[in-house]
Amino acid sequence: MESKRVVVTGLGAITPIGKTFPEYWEGLVNGRNGAGEITRFDSTLYKTHFACEVKDYNPEDYFEKKNVRKYDHFAQFGLIAADEAIADSGISAENCDLDEVGVMMTSGIGGVNHLYHETMEYAQGDGTPRFGPFLITKMIVNMIGGVISIKYGFRGPNYATVSACASSTHSIIEAFDKIRFGKCIAVVAGGGGAAIGQLGIGGFNAMKALSTRNDDPMTASRPFDLNRDGFVMGEGAGSLVLEEYEHAIARGAKIYAEVVGGGSSADAYHITAPHPEGAGGVLSMQRALNDAGLTPEAIDHINAHGTSTPMGDLAECMAIQKVFGEHAYNISINSTKSMTGHLLGGAGAVEAIATILALKNGIIPPTINHFDDDPQIDSKLDIVFNKARQRDIHYGLSNSFGFGGQNATVIFKKFE
């Protein structure tokens, strides 16, 4: 069966540097820093006291009180981003068969904060099991897709792909496959994360994954820098409406970019550490290129996973050089996590949006907080440090690599 073309017709985002996708893009281009002291809870006893929170977030600005009680923050963020993307795309019952509209929205670890609070209330009680009626539904990852379909009546395929930090990139690839192979005419894809809480910060501290640069949190997320010491937790969500090309053209939709390939792989190495030579990332990128029918020389830009961890950033650079060879030096590379922090399961979605808007606008957002070169990272790699750069690009690749060694890569093409 001949595969169909797939395009992006709607975008939505709520992030630490902007609560709509235009605000997010403006923040990226201007190098806005989303880090600050944690306000979600008292972090005094924790090793990390800072994160990239969504600023001035009040759920009641977006939801009725009865729904604030029902949805954990990760699902709230996911629905906010999806609302924006759906409105931006213009898909509705008037121009789409809702039976053929799917939802592939996800999260890396779901409602961990709500789980913590309910568990603590139980532990501090007399042992009588008293749990709220929304405990389970506020925890489970697939609830984002559920609430979106309930609100909009989308009755197509609806499930969540969970692969830690690669979750929402996998969701975009799933959506791409559903449309190109004729199972859907449109899919709302993406994901969210809201793990800035006692469990999230405490758990990642215990793994030694988070930066502990408490004396200078604004410069803590510094991908590819010599003195990087771990990632900075972020929160928020991103959502994209993917649509079959002919259907989008027929209804006069605006088109941001075309999705042309996706690849995934496993490191088969370690539960948290990347393969030291980036072997899984190599396979993921190669498979995305093969899926798109592209040679390595076609890629102009890479939005790197780039978490600001000592091992991860180095392994990704090694993987890029192995896949692209000498052409790697012609590719602009950035990490937007330097500004947003790491949104965990939502990271791939907001970074896909950054890649798409870089293609559309011809601007590469910077990797901020670069001070000292890492001698282990090839200095000839064109990492865009500290200031945005104008550049006409035609193919952009976005990487997401998750704990468990689960990797995903998606490739977008500029729509002309």
Tell where the protein language model's regions lie, with residue ranges:
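ACP-dependent fatty acid/polyketide chain-elongation machinery
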Residues: 1-67, 89, 246-256, 353-367, ...
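Flexible, low-complexity linker/loop segments at domain and module junctions
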Residues: 1-8, 95-98, 292-298, 329, ...
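Condensing-enzyme catalytic core mediating Claisen C-C bond formation in acyl metabolism
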Residues: 5-9, 36, 215-292, 300-301
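Conserved beta-ketoacyl condensing-enzyme motif
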Residues: 8, 24-25, 29-163, 178, ...
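Acyl-CoA/ACP chain-elongation machinery
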Residues: 39, 183-229, 262-276, 306-313, ...
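Active-site-proximal alpha-helical scaffold in enzymes
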Residues: 78-91, 144-145, 149-152, 157-193, ...
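Phosphate/pyrophosphate-binding loops at sites that engage ATP/ADP/AMP, CoA/4′-phosphopantetheine
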Residues: 85-97, 248-252, 285-301, 323-327
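Glycine-/small-residue-rich "gating" segment that lines the acyl/pantetheine channel
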Residues: 125-132, 173, 177, 181, ...
